[in-house]
Amino acid sequence: MDDILTTLSVFWLSALVFYVLVHRGLWIFTDVTRTMSMFTLEKALGPGIDLVEGRKGSAPRAWIMQSVLWLFVGAIFTFEGLWLNHEPDALHALSSWGYNPTAETLSATGEIVTLWGGIAMALIGSGMYVLPKLLGTDLASEKNATLVSFLWTFSIVVYMIGSQNSEILGLDIMMIGTGINVIALLAVIMNQLLTLSNRSGSIPMPAWLIIFGLVSDPLSLIAAALTGSLTTGAGQWLVYHMIGGGFFFLSTAGVVLYATTVVSGNALWSRTLNGAILIGGLFTINTFGDIDGSIAAAHLGLAAEEMVFSGGADVTASFLLAMSAIPVVAFAANSLITLRGGDALLENYNGWSEINLGSLAIIPIFLASLFLQTDAVTGTNAIGGMSSTIETMALWAVMVPLSFGSAMALYPSITGRRLASMARARQAFWLMSVGVLLGLMVTLMSDVIGMALMDAGVEDPS
């Protein structure tokens, strides 16, 4: 059995055990652990828990508001990275302050801030509203969830510093940020599991998507650590994509599918497709993201190893990458048909346009990402020059519209207020969609031209 399949087998087994524990329940898990967990979430924190309010909806609101701020910061760094990629000396004046940014560092910072600050916080915040609604209960601890949002924000600040300067005073800054982030994530998981234990009925499929999205992050790391994959390039690549397919894709699917029912007023078009999304998200390898595992290695304080697949691992990885088309197509079909069901086009509803854009864009960007990943896995590396632009497209044309479209659709219900201006929301949508699609398409054409020049033996103009 190759390393890829070994790691995935451990992950699949742990996911199955988790499902059995949650679905059937154990008396020691529901009685003793619940009491201890509630104590840990609130009273164990002492006076610190009184710094935040515990009103209903305060936690989702805090997470979503901070995600908006991080999205703004991520957009700035992403733009500056693209700018320096075409004009390396554009920010040369900053060297007088001792700061010498490069396109690579700014792009990396933009990706981290957008992904973990903007998108992840929007998904977690929306999930804190969606899960209790689906389960007919309240969030276990609004106070703890609100307080943890600031801890998560602090981890993003550390990430942002670490992406610019990875080591300060001999300390690995990225690893410190990961440690803080893991603590915050474990608190979120504990809070949501306690919410799940207080349910009044069965668990709907979107709730399973959100729960598995949260727990797949630590389960992926545990599986890779147990099999020793974290020290290999292929293992680092796998962990990166397992988290992408679990935490980000499944969480997005759960939140978006609920939001589409809110936007359209229709029931989900197909429950069968929901099952395909969950099983496919767990049992395949997500294609979106980088073509190596350097980012995962940096987050874990490890040296980035060369990505080498041996023992048939490349065949396994390529097959599972191709099979990930099933959950992606199932998600796009279910969300779009639910959104447009009954021939009711609600373009003015909060988040309708954003969810529609993300659901439409996910298929072509998935195909582009699939070609990139299989090209890298097989060692061909013929189109690797487009990876950065395709990755940025996946963030800004798919993940950002889906996560923030859902947040916009749910935010009025969370706060009990209306959006300040629908006109501004519409303007923001057109600016984002036109800017992302047009700007990145031009950048993609530039990448293709650059690869053609390099293949022809012409000096790289950049």
Language-model features: locations:
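Hydrophobic cores of alpha-helical transmembrane segments in multi-pass integral membrane proteins
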Residues: 3-44, 60-87, 92, 100-135, ...
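Cytosolic juxtamembrane amphipathic/interface segments immediately preceding
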Residues: 45-59
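Inter-helical loop and helix-membrane interface segments of multi-pass membrane transporters/permeases
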Residues: 165-173, 230-235
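Extended, leucine-rich alpha-helical cores of fungal transcription factors
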Residues: 200-208
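Membrane-interface helix termini and inter-helical loops of multi-pass transporters
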Residues: 230-234, 298-306, 378-381
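Loop-rich catalytic cores of soluble enzymes, especially ATP-dependent carboxylate-amine ligases
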Residues: 234-242, 307-311
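Alpha-helical multipass membrane-protein architecture
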Residues: 265, 299-315
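Conformational-control "hinges and anchors"
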Residues: 347
